[in-house]
Structure formats: C-alpha cells, structure tokens
Design a protein with these regions (language model features):
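Conserved small-residue motifs centered on glycine
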Residues: 48-49, 383, 387-514, 519
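Conserved luminal/periplasmic juxtamembrane motif of membrane-embedded glycan-processing enzymes
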Residues: 48, 197-200, 292, 328-331, ...
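Ligand-binding "clamshell"
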Residues: 111-127, 329-352
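Loop/turn elements at helix/coil->beta-strand transitions in domains of secreted/extracellular proteins
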Residues: 40-43, 69-74, 94-99, 120-123, ...
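Glycine-rich, aromatic-lined ligand/substrate-binding cores of catalytic
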Residues: 279-280, 284-291, 304-325, 333-336, ...
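Short acidic loop-to-helix transition motifs that present clustered carboxylates
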Residues: 80-84, 300-303, 346-347
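Helix-loop-helix "hinge/cap" segment bordering the ligand-binding cleft or interdomain interface
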Residues: 126, 153-238, 258-311, 365-376, ...
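Conserved N-terminal structural module of periplasmic/extracytoplasmic solute-binding proteins
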Residues: 1-197, 244-251, 255-258, 267-271, ...
C-alpha cells in the first residue's frame, strides 16, 4: 500500500451521483441526507476531556465544520486515562476500528503509527497530501523540517500533523528571572556576566530583610534538580553549561533526547563534555557559599519552589527559572521580577535550546484502511488547515467564547482590566473550559506564526513569557544551536531507548546532585563516565545518529523524486 490516491469504490460512486466534491470546493459532502442514508456517517474516535461537559458533537466548532463542509462525523470519546491501553487493544485485534483516529494522546501519534506500520491498519497519506491537499502541501514544502518529522522510517506518512507555532515558545526553556526590587534596594544593576550574577546572589544572601516581612528569609537562588521539568525551565544547571563551553539540552517533551545536541552535524552526548564538569564545580561553589535553596534537591515535584515559595504573598527568591510568569500568583510579587539577559561566562554564553518542535504530533487524524471515504477526510483536514480563522478557533476555542473581534477585526481573547481571562460562559469560565467545550482541539490543526496580529492576537497568557525568553537570548540561542529533530523511529529503536535512556538520565541527575553538594573529584568524574558507558550511552548516540541520518535521506529522497517528477526525468536519486 504505497499511499496511493486511488478513489475507493464508494468514493467513485458518490462522486458520480453528485453526493461529494473532491475538487477542493465546499461543501465536500453536497447532499448530507442522501450521503448519510446511503453510507452512514464517517466515524471518528477522540479522547475525552475532564473539562468537557457536553458531547463533542455539540461543540460550536464541530457544528461550524458541518455547516461549511457538509460532513457530520459520528464521534466516539474514550477516557484519556486509559486511552493508550484501549487503542492498543483495538489495533492488535483489528476489530472495532473507527474510520479515523482524531488523536492518540498528546505526542503519541507518531510512535503508534510506526508500531503498526506493517499491519496495514493505517492508510499512507503522502500521495493524498501531494494530490488533494494544496494547503497542507504548501506548509510542508515551506517547512522541510516538518515533512522530515512526519515521515516514518519506511518513507510513508500516516494521518496529518498537528502544528502549533507560537514564535518558538517551546523551543527554549522558560525564562530565568531575577528580583529587580531587591537589586534596586541593594543599588545593583541587572547582571550581564556570570561573575556579576554571582555577586548579586551574594548580595541577596547578605541583604537582610529584603522583602520587608521582618525576617531574614531571602533565598538567593532556587533551582530544582528533580525530574518532570517543563521544557528545561526549573533546573538552572543546564542553563549555565554553555557559559563553560558546551550547552546541554534538557526537555520533558522529548526526554529520550535529553543531553543530546547536533554538533557539526554529529549527535553528541553533551553531559560528557568537560563543560559539564566545570558547571558542576561552579554549582558546588554556589552551594558552599550558601546561595542555593536547601529544598532544591527534593525528588517530589510537589516540594519544588514552583509549588511553594513562588506562591507566597512576599517575594522569597532572588533568582529562579519559571515556565510561565503566571506561576507567580501574587501580582505584587510578580511585578518585582525581570528577565536576566544572556550572561557571558568564561568560555561562552548561558542558555540552551530544547530538542523539541512546534509540530507536536506527526500523525493525528489517522485514517484507517477500512475507511470508505479517505479523500473526504483529507479534504476536510485541508479545509481546516487552509482557513486560518478556522484553524485558530479549532485549536483554541470558538469565537464568542475564547475569542472576540478587537477594533481591527482580529480574534482576541476577552480580558478584564487586570489582564485576566473574561471570556467563556458562567459555566465555562476559564480558557481551558471554554476550549474543551467549543472544540475537540488537538486534531490536525495548524497555527502558523504569520497568523499573529493578522488573524488572531498572540495567546494572552504567553505574551510576557515570550518577551522574557527573548531577553534571555532566545533568538541568538536558536540561531546558534542545532537541536535533534523530533524524528520518527523504528519500533526496535524505541524499545532499546526505553531500556537504556531512563538509567542514563537518572545517572546524570544523581551525579549532579552529588557534585553540587559534595564537589567533583577525578574519581567521581571517571566513575560517572564509566557508569554512563555501562548504561548504554554509546547506543543512545548511535540510535539517534541513525534516525537523524535516515530522516535526512528520506527527505532528500522525497525532494529528488519531486524534482524528478517535475522535470519528468527518468533518473533516480534515491
């Protein structure tokens, strides 16, 4: 099955009878009643949301889609918590399959379709995209890395991608911030070098009652050394590796690729670089100076500063990382902080990039081989992709709930005078509730950077986050570092990664805590290296190198076959 675009017998018949249009015009189903009487509805399975209090079929966007396209899907919702189990049972038995899997759970579509790629369950879609989906094809042509990320190891694509561009928001950690009020009180400038930053921390340590609560309880810096980090935002260690000569990478959204970077085109395990040791020595100095919060080493995330210190009614922390400024719930405390500029160190600058992508799922809206109307589904996705206003509302929630038109006619989230959410309804009174109850979300929507301020306003609760990231040096960091693309892997590669990567990651985490508290010796550095080797670090690098090379070859192959097709040349460059 080569991703052929042969129409099914049912599609040919419905086309002959004038029930459907496959030329890109709307509606796609021209006579809904006659179509459904003859063929029934196209069935779609999605994941339920705890926030959704109505049937997905009754959401505003689903009704809008039917109004525009004539397609009324028959929706089945399965509980999110047991979704992976249920979907695997469906796929193993091959029984009870829907025509379309809307989603498999956040970030899970790629591995799922690869795992079942040789079972003839999912329809390859690369040719359908090229021949029937001009809107999606253009986006993939304009962004070769996205085509690379949706191509399975066998060269096929399955389903269609979910892309949420937000000006690179998830491609670097959340902001590193410092208490400007305390700096002012101590007559200090915002630091621009690592040395100046250390001097600021020492001043916070010795500054007495900086927050005015009558106690000497200012904490100079609060990192958190546990796992479950959000986009590498809380563990300050990795931010400083670049200052010592080799930036590391750490990101919960793609954890198998933690500590990997492309350096001169080669996959490199950066936590073995000498810079990592120097960073550990530096953090041990900070610890010995009494600058690091003593709660930073708890294993349980409910004990992290983000769940405790950051929520108090007075500022407690001099410098910390956050994923979003909204984590600081007290407005007065919030307004004391500013972002730290990228700091110059002895052998480079601070900051790191995440091995992540704004293409969050490669294979949503996955069409099964039993679907009688695959081209109708494909044209539906291209309708959703091709109309930016539909794409934005399908992703984040409907107009009249999460969006109103501002004075320029652009979709904007309604906010009160304090900048808090003021949309939705009495029952759906948060952005999340109004989203869940007006769209199924997380299918194959595509939101592009170019839509901001032309179609919709930038997501209201991420405005400060992005500004602060830019102060941290986001643009330069993204230009300087080559990250590991989120490529799809063979099932046996994933199995091996699942065996070795958690041990590798735990080893790094364990040694960091030991080094920060006890210092680094030649012996401990040597035992760290040998433990990582025994855990399979060379295999890890090799698997990623193979996957990255294969994806590049697949991309070159598809590019050369396209150019060959366009010049009708007979030579092949595969």
């Amino acid at each position: 099955n080569s991703g052929a675009t042969e129409l099914t017998a049912e599609e040919k018949e419905a086309l002959d009878e004038g029930l459907i249009a496959l030329d890109g015009s709307l509606p796609i189903i021209k006579d809904k009643e006659a179509f459904e009487e003859k063929y029934g509805k196209i069935t779609v399975q999605t994941l339920g949301s705890a926030d959704r209090t109505i049937d997905v079929a009754d959401t505003a966007m689903v009704k809008k889609w039917t109004e525009d396209t004539g397609i009324e899907f028959e929706w089945t919702e399965i509980p999110s918590e047991s979704a992976t189990e249920k979907i695997n049972l469906q796929l193993v038995s091959g029984a009870d399959l829907p025509d379309v899997f809307w989603t498999f759970g956040d970030g899970k579509s790629g591995n799922t379709v690869v795992q079942y790629a040789d079972q003839d369950i999912f329809l390859p879609t690369e040719n359908i995209i090229d021949e029937y989906m001009p809107n999606l094809k253009k986006i993939l042509d304009d962004n070769p890395q996205y085509r690379q990320e949706i191509t399975a190891p066998n060269g096929h694509t399955y389903g269609f991608p979910y892309i949420e561009e937000m000006k690179g928001l998830v491609l670097t950690p959340g902001p590193l911030i410092i208490n400007k009020t305390w700096l002012d009180e101590l007559s200090l400038e915002v630091p621009t070098t690592v040395d100046e930053w250390v001097e600021c921390l020492k001043a916070f340590r010795d500054g007495g009652d900086l927050n005015g609560n009558g106690e000497d309880d200012a904490i100079p810096m609060a990192p958190w050394f546990g796992a479950d980090d959000t986009f590498g935002s809380y563990n300050m260690f990795y931010r400083f590796t670049g200052a010592f000569g080799c930036a590391d990478s750490y990101c919960g959204g793609n954890e198998y690729a933690d500590h990997l970077r492309l350096v001169d085109g080669k996959v490199t395990f950066t936590a073995l670089d000498e810079a990592f040791r120097k960073t550990a020595e530096f953090f041990n100095m900070l610890y010995d100076e009494g600058l690091i919060w003593n709660g930073s080493f708890e294993a349980d995330s409910s004990a992290a500063y983000t769940a405790s210190l950051i929520k108090e009614d007075v500022a407690r922390i001099g410098c910390m990382g956050v994923w979003t400024d909204q984590e600081i719930t007290n407005l007065d405390v919030h307004d004391q902080y500013v972002a730290v500029p990228r700091l110059q160190g002895e052998a480079g600058m601070t900051g790191s990039a995440n091995n992540y992508s704004e293409l969050q799922d490669s294979s949503n809206t996955a069409i099964t081989t039993t679907c009688k109307f695959p081209h109708v589904v494909a044209l539906f996705v291209d309708y959703m992709v091709g109309d930016p206003e539909i794409a934005v509302q399908s992703n984040w929630g409907a107009e009249g709930y999460n969006y109103v038109r501002d004075e320029e006619g652009i979709l904007a989230t309604p906010l009160d005078e304090n900048g808090y959410y003021a949309g939705g309804t009495e029952e759906w009174n948060t952005f999340g509730l109004a989203r869940a109850n007006t769209t199924p979300a997380r299918g194959s929507m595509i939101v592009l950077d170019e839509y901001y301020d032309t179609v919709c306003r930038y997501t209201y609760d991420a405005v400060t986050l992005l500004e602060w990231q830019k102060v941290n040096g986001k643009d330069d960091i993204l230009a300087e570092y080559d990250t590991i693309p989120r490529v799809l892997m063979e099932t046996d590669e994933l199995t091996r990664l699942a065996q070795i990567q958690p041990t590798i990651s735990d080893t790094v985490d364990r040694y960091i805590v030991d080094w920060v508290t006890n210092g680094v010796t030649d012996e401990s550095w040597a035992s760290y290296q040998s433990e990582l080797e025994a855990a399979g670090v060379n295999d890890l690098v090799e698997i990623y190198q193979t996957a990255v090379d294969r994806a590049a070859e697949n991309e070159a192959g598809s590019a050369s076959s396209e150019s060959a097709a366009s010049t009708s040349s007979t030579s092949s460059a595969s």
